[in-house]
Regions:
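Terminal accessory/targeting
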Residues: 2-185, 197, 204-213, 336-374
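Active-site-adjacent pocket scaffolds in enzyme catalytic domains
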Residues: 19-45, 297-318, 322-335
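Exposed alpha-helical structural elements
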Residues: 48, 144, 232-233, 323, ...
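Charged/polar, solvent-exposed surface patches and flexible loops
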Residues: 51, 83, 90, 94, ...
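Metal-dependent polysaccharide deacetylase catalytic core of the NodB/CE4 family, i.e.
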Residues: 114-125, 132-136, 182-184, 194-196, ...
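Short, composition-biased local secondary-structure segments
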Residues: 160-177, 255-271, 325-327
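Aromatic/hydrophobic pocket-lining residues that form the small-molecule binding cavity
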Residues: 199, 259, 263, 324, ...
């Protein structure tokens, strides 16, 4: 067993030497059970959580030194890793309590309201009790979660030097885990693009799908769009979607000397275009990186931070539109609630969002409107 772990470490060192460019991708075509009801959703969710947990426990046997070496992180945050692990365990236990009773016995039997140790025991059934038509999905899922868990642990391990969405810094921050079961919010960063670009196409697709979300605008790109098309045209193009700020420039604000200027300038441009009467004006820090000083400054201006817990990774050239939708679907089943991060400056969200909506159309998930954020 020890030799297997050491091989895993060496392989992971190679894979993670390039950091976040290694992205967990799933293949939903390998899931051979129906997705036509709330029960079907819960059966799939249960199995995703069990495979995640099985992989989580495999990685958890690494000691701190081995883990940080695997992640390629020096002087990592022990507390950040411990916090993420504890929160993850608690979230999984809570998620199992939300499963329909008749889904508990399907495929892999799990007792009602299981404890974390009982869930660990249930994962031992996966290799022997899964039907033949789910074996390929199982192998793909294990590979997905191995990479995904390391994605999360890497963020947690680096949280002492670089903050991110992996942990909240203040009770007022929202990341999606505070939402109700099977409730999801769509969010889109970095726009707007120029006229008839990806932003415009995505807005039209959202309207066709009867969906909306929050667009976090970059002040510099908004200025360019206003200069090209006029303030009134920009103000009307987003329809029922809400607007948030992504600051003036897309740079990490955690150590940026003029972060206050960047925030204020972007806010001024956005508020000159959009009406925020009875609407919360959210802020999303670039890369999710912020400091307590930034949080306090924003709160004084009644501008809470909105993070995310489901990252589509749609910005990467290494992941296709189909892989984006499969990744998001898988994480929606795993976490059972959340804020989903897309980017409207790239084309993949316009393909992935309709595919995700179609996949879950019979499962009674709730697409949150911005004013329904918990």
């Amino acid at each position: 067993m020890r030799k297997v772990l050491l091989l895993f470490i060496l392989l992971s060192n190679f894979l993670f030497s390039q950091g976040p460019s290694n992205i967990a991708t799933a293949n939903r075509d390998l899931w051979k059970l129906p997705m036509k009801s709330t029960k079907d959703f819960d059966v799939a969710s249960k199995l995703e959580m069990l495979v995640f947990l099985e992989t989580f426990k495999d990685i958890d046997v690494l000691n701190e030194s081995e883990l940080f070496k695997t992640l390629g992180v020096k002087d990592g945050s022990s507390s950040g890793v411990k916090t993420w692990k504890k929160q993850t365990q608690d979230r999984l236990v809570s998620n199992f309590k939300d499963l329909e009773a008749d889904a508990l016995s399907e495929v892999i039997s799990v007792k009602a309201n299981p404890t974390f140790p009982e869930l660990v025991l249930a994962t031992k059934k996966l290799s022997n009790e899964l039907p033949e038509n789910l074996k390929n999905w199982y192998q793909n899922s294990k590979s997905f979660y191995k990479t995904y868990i390391l994605e999360c642990l890497r963020l947690a391990a680096k949280s002492n030097k670089r903050t991110s969405e992996i942990n909240t810094l203040d009770p007022t921050e929202k990341n999606g885990f505070e939402s109700k079961d099977k409730s999801y919010l769509l969010t889109f960063d970095d726009g707007p693009t120029q006229k008839n670009g990806h932003t415009d196409k995505l807005i039209n697709i959202l309207k066709e799908q009867h969906l909306n979300g929050i667009f976090f605008l970059s002040g510099d790109k908004l200025q360019q769009r206003i200069a090209a098309n006029g303030k009134n045209n920009v103000a009307s193009m987003y329809g029922e979607n809400w607007i948030g700020s992504h600051s003036m420039v897309h740079k990490s604000h955690q150590y940026l000397p003029d972060w206050k200027l960047q925030i204020d300038e972007s806010n001024s441009i956005i508020k000159d275009v959009f009406d925020f009467n009875n609407k919360t004006f959210y802020f999303r820090p670039p890369y999710g990186q912020r400091s307590p000083e930034i949080i306090n400054y924003l709160l004084k201006n009644k501008q809470p931070i909105l993070l995310w817990n489901i990252d589509s990774q749609d910005w990467s050239e290494k992941i296709s539109s189909q892989e984006v939708s499969s990744r998001v679907i898988t994480l929606m089943l795993l976490w059972r609630k959340g804020i989903i991060l897309f980017h409207d400056v790239h084309p993949k969200a316009a393909v992935a969002v309709p595919a995700i909506n179609e996949y879950f159309k019979d499962c009674q998930i709730k697409w949150l409107k911005p004013d329904e954020i918990q």
